[in-house]
């Protein structure tokens, strides 16, 4: 999520000087999507940022925020936004208390780690939450810069918002899996002359036929 959002902001004219990436996969994505950025520890990125994007799993967000606040890594006036769907700005309270302007900016889409993420991000809705109209204006501007559509979500409704998206997504995944299985069965058998064989490889014939209908 982080490298995709960073690349989208960079395309909009922001300078992404640094990223924090721990896993080999995330470091590789950062190197490809943000080749001019330095990979640094989170505290160093935070200390030098005017806009700090926290794109970590929901279960790790509170710990990261607490650590950054304890280390005094975020300067007053820094815009800090997280990409979690389940959390509003309450989880960022330790940084708000230190003078940061905090936002929740959640892209409502599934990330695959592939190039298509960037294209889909430009057409995604973003659930945004802020403390006041100034915060909402900044969040909306950031989302629009990335090509997305900002949608306001009240702080007290973030849990319901996330649950609704997860519920819908899980059912859609089940439906798509079932549809792919049925389509593969319908297309299997002796191959027609010149037609690609039907298999379960990613981006196979069944996936390509279903994609325009499911998107």
For each predicted feature, which ranges?
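Short phosphate-binding/catalytic loops that engage adenosine nucleotides
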Residues: 14-15, 100, 148, 188
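Internal alpha-helical scaffold of NAD(P)-dependent oxidoreductase catalytic cores
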Residues: 29-33, 95, 116-215
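Conserved SAM-binding loop
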Residues: 19, 53-54, 128
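Rossmann-like NAD(P)(H) cofactor-binding subdomain of soluble oxidoreductases
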Residues: 24, 38-116
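Phosphate- and divalent-cation-binding pockets in alpha/beta enzyme and binding domains
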Residues: 4, 29, 63-64, 90-91, ...
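Primarily hydrophobic membrane-targeting regions of prokaryotic envelope proteins
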Residues: 1, 51-54, 165
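NAD(P)+-binding Rossmann beta1-loop-alpha1 motif at the extreme N-terminus of oxidoreductases
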Residues: 1-47
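Short, solvent-exposed amphipathic alpha-helical segments in soluble enzyme
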Residues: 10, 69-71, 97, 142-145
